[in-house]
Amino acid sequence: RVRAEDQVTSLYGALGNYLTRNGLTLQDVRRIVLTGVGASYTEGDIFGIPTCKVDEFSASAAGALALSGREQGVVVTMGTGTAFLWAEQNGTVRHLCGSGIGGGTMGGLCRKLVGMERFGQIRELARQGDLSKVDLTIKDISQNPAATLDPDLTAANFGNLAEDATPADLAAGVVNLVLQAVGIMTVLACQACNTDTVILTGAMTTMPQAVENFQNFQRLFGYQYVIPENATFATAIGAALCSLRDTPDNNP
């Protein structure tokens, strides 16, 4: 990851980093494809290399379907915030809704609560945490919950915060809050689209808690949650695929 004060500096830094890590030069690059909100900050070709832009939603949808091998489904891109799309292999892409809860939420809360904002640091710290010292569960408030309610379900995020909660416990609570908020919205999206398939992409999919969290949603609601290989790079891969589809040539 390249950290910079502005989008353009980040772009050029990321490109240089990619070339260096892969032993490439600018002469090896035949096309540059930009996507995401940061793409709006640049115009024209980069370093004289043919450069084009692809709509982020189209890129995310194409990448998710290609990596998962699914014909259609709800695509969830968990980035700084979270976007929910309906996507089909025939090219249909519909933006369902979005949420301000995502990786940015996790980073901001953890910076204040535990003094960390780096994704890797939070991921490792949260793995050591105990959610029972942070969250209130159904079994904490009811001896006879409804049949549709698992006793271990969260009744209130941060609703049972212990005085001796450690930084690891707090980090685990933040990660759980973000993943569960996203999970609930996937249920609503599936109901709206009459589908049972959810394809998850973005950096948050690499959190160890992500698999367990969405397995719980799958068990409770019967939807299929797919985290494809290379899900972190789904939007970038989709941008490349869209570019090849829209402007095919002999030198991809």
Model-based region annotation:
Residues R1-G13, V93:
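Short glycine-rich, Thr/Ser-proximal phosphate-binding strand/loop in the N-terminal lobe
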Residues L15-R30, M185-T197:
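Phosphate/pyrophosphate-binding loops at sites that engage ATP/ADP/AMP, CoA/4′-phosphopantetheine
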Residues N90-A146:
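Glycine-rich phosphate-binding loop plus the immediately following alpha-helix
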Residues A61-S68, M106-C110, Y225-P252:
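Glycine-rich phosphate-binding/hydrolytic loop that grips phosphoryl groups
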Residues T42, G48, C52-V76, G81, ...:
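Conserved phosphate-binding catalytic cores of ATP/NTP-utilizing and phosphoryl-transfer enzymes
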Residues L34-T42, L188-F217, T232:
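Glycine-rich phosphate-binding loops at beta-strand->alpha-helix junctions
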Residues P50-F57, Q215-G238:
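Conserved phosphate-binding/catalytic loops in two-lobed NTP-binding clefts
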Residues A147-T197, T232:
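Adenine-nucleotide phosphate-binding core of ATP-dependent small-molecule kinases
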